[in-house]
């Protein structure tokens, strides 16, 4: 909702759950206007992705901000040895591919969809390389994770979040030709249903002692960091929003 006060016309909320409509309704009530537009669908579906951009563009003009935040976890040890048989069981390749599709490929292609449309609009106007005398044409913020530095039991999740760092670094170099910025925020353990599902006893024992703040990060603190990266044109690269996390040895 902070974006509503910064001149943003509208925000497309994309999720597979029915709850996306309720979230949009709550944001609109807070903003006092029809600000959030819900879209229910699979972020890995190319046709759905294009339809979201088409719909928002028709209603509110070209998309210039992109925060592809969908993510899943399928956590298991990379290799586990059966105590009875002595046989090693390695992490499921199908699960790995699923996490990569949702957490890495989908975010990159949502960003590229926006950049491609901005590039087409500029080409149609006879514009080529963006110059500092112009306004910034767009901003991308990927949602990384402290797990990008490695985390036990998260071979697939950590790989995708590290992959976003490489994707962002490449997009930063390429997309500025079209006037588009790109960055990554790396949230720490945040007070969300996914983290609470670990059990608060586990959180108290295995997470909080390794944060400087000694508490879970509030979702609005992550939102503030995203808004900061979106709206401050001098900011690029990576921003760690981790409550002073230091991983245990």
Positions of the model-derived regions?
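Active-site-adjacent segment of SDR/Rossmann-fold oxidoreductases
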Residues: 6, 170-180, 233
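Conserved NAD(P)H cofactor-binding loop of Rossmann-fold oxidoreductase domains
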Residues: 69-83, 244
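A glycine/serine/threonine-rich, flexible loop-to-helix segment
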Residues: 80-82, 177, 189-211, 249
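Catalytic loop of short-chain dehydrogenase/reductase
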Residues: 86-93, 119-163, 168-177, 189
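Substrate-binding pocket helix/loop in short-chain dehydrogenase/reductase
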Residues: 77-97, 207
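C-terminal substrate-recognition "lid" of short-chain dehydrogenase/reductases
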Residues: 215-242, 246
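Canonical Rossmann dinucleotide-binding motif of NAD(H)/NADP(H)-dependent dehydrogenases/reductases
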Residues: 1-12
């Amino acid at each position: 909702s902070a974006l509503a006060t910064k001149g943003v016309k509208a925000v497309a909320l994309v999720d597979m759950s029915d709850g996306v409509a309720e979230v949009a309704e709550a944001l609109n009530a807070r903003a006092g206007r029809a600000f959030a537009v819900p879209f229910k669908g699979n972020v890995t579906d190319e046709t759905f992705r294009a339809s979201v951009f088409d719909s928002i563009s028709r209603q509110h003009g070209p998309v210039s901000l992109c925060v592809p935040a969908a993510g899943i976890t399928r956590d298991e040890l990379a290799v586990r040895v059966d105590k009875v048989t002595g046989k090693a069981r390695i992490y499921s390749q199908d699960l790995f591919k699923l996490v990569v599709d949702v957490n890495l490929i989908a975010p990159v292609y949502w960003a590229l969809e926006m950049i491609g449309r901005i590039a087409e609009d500029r080409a149609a106007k006879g514009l080529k390389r963006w110059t500092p005398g112009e306004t910034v044409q767009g901003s991308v913020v990927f949602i990384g994770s402290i797990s990008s530095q490695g985390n036990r039991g998260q071979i697939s999740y950590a790989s995708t979040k590290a992959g976003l760092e490489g994707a962002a670094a490449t997009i930063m170099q390429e997309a500025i030709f079209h006037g588009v910025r790109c960055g990554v925020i790396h949230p720490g353990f945040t007070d969300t249903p996914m983290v609470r599902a670990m059990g608060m006893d586990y959180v108290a024992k295995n997470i909080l002692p390794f944060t400087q703040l000694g508490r879970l990060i509030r979702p609005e603190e992550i939102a503030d960091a995203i808004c900061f990266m979106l709206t401050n044109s001098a900011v690029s690269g990576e921003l760690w929003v981790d409550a002073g996390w230091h991983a245990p040895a």
